[in-house]
Amino acid sequence: MAGRLIFHCDGNNFFASCECIEHPEWRDVPMAVAGDPKDRCGIVVAKNELAKKAGVKTTDTIWQARQKCPNILFVPPHHDEYARVSRRMNAIFREYTDFVEPASIDESYLDMTGAPGFYGLSPRELADLLRERVREEIGITISVGVSFCKVFAKMGSDYRKPDATTLIFRENYQEMLYPLPVATMLYAGRASVQTMARHGIRTIGELAARSRADLRRMLGKSGEQLWLYANGLDDSPVRRYEDKPEVKSVSRGMTFRRDLVNMEEVRCGVSVLVDEIAATLRQSGLKGSVISVTLKAPTLHTLSHQVTLPHPTYLQQEIRTVTMQLITDHWSVSAKSPVRSITVGVSHLSGENEAYTEQLSLFDLCTSVGNAEKEPTVGLEKQEKVEAAVAKLRQRLGNDAVSLGCYDNDEIGVRRYGKKR
């Protein structure tokens, strides 16, 4: 058991469990958290154990879930509450180690190396203590995987649920994991599993037994990585809680309550998405130089385009103008050619203080992107002052206090930044 001691703590049925904190009576009935069918996102995003036993699965539509479990209770998601519970969970973990790395809202890695000796507890006792504290102080359960690397710790928390501790060490990992289907190997996607099956690899043990070169020939770099993980060769560190992961892009998307049939409706949706993106970039001290947009039709046909700007930006109006130009250039929105959903992204990020050699006006920028009808433009310096002032007002009064070119449209399901959808 020499070396590192890594925990992976995973909230069980997290969204559903959070809802049951305020409504403990829901624990005794089949319950699922699901989107609003009116917004065309009526799918199950989490379910409790009773719904799970009835066969309800995450991503089931509401109709499918009700077919499997006629008496199921559906509740809408409350993401602010889930974030609050997540912070409380991590606060408990941070009492035992500075190395707490949230992997998502409901799971975190902990580097507990040295903790057993310090606290006078075995690894299992420490994991059980964390489970007990989360259960008693917050009101939800977690499963904890304990291992010498992050990959096996994660597989440990998946191994036995709910409210369980699983230890996977060098002495027992082959016995525990190698008989499992290769599809249960962390990061083994469906296509990779199918490729490995064609080469006679159906268990994790068979994956580990093949040569590293074989896996690279089969699957490229991802195959080599899977081979390393299957053999317990994962030395990726656990970050400190304060160390933020590198942000590579910021994007927002939305499926609208009904199809968008004109450019004014598209502009309304784009404005709200871009407002959130620009606020996130500014709060993170980042700018981006590549703007992308993805449109999806009711037929689920998808169209994506992007453009590289002559300089990085986090200005809402600039991002919106370029996004609208991309849409105008590539999609004639109408009742015959409607839009079901839009996703806007900004990537190739850099620090906000990074200098660039040329400041073009928005008019020049539009000219470089295309020649279709342009939105009203404002000089970059003036627009920067406007958006900086808006950011300060939002900080004081709330995100929904001021909007920039955005408005609510209940018919298509759009709410301004900061207002609950």
Predicted regions and their residues:
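Short, charged/polar surface micro-motifs in flexible loops or helix N-caps
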Residues: 12-14, 37-40, 298-301, 349-352
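Short, histidine-centered active-site or binding-site loop motifs used for metal coordination
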Residues: 112-114, 254, 308, 366
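C-terminal hydrophobic structural anchor segments
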Residues: 313-314, 318-325, 329-392
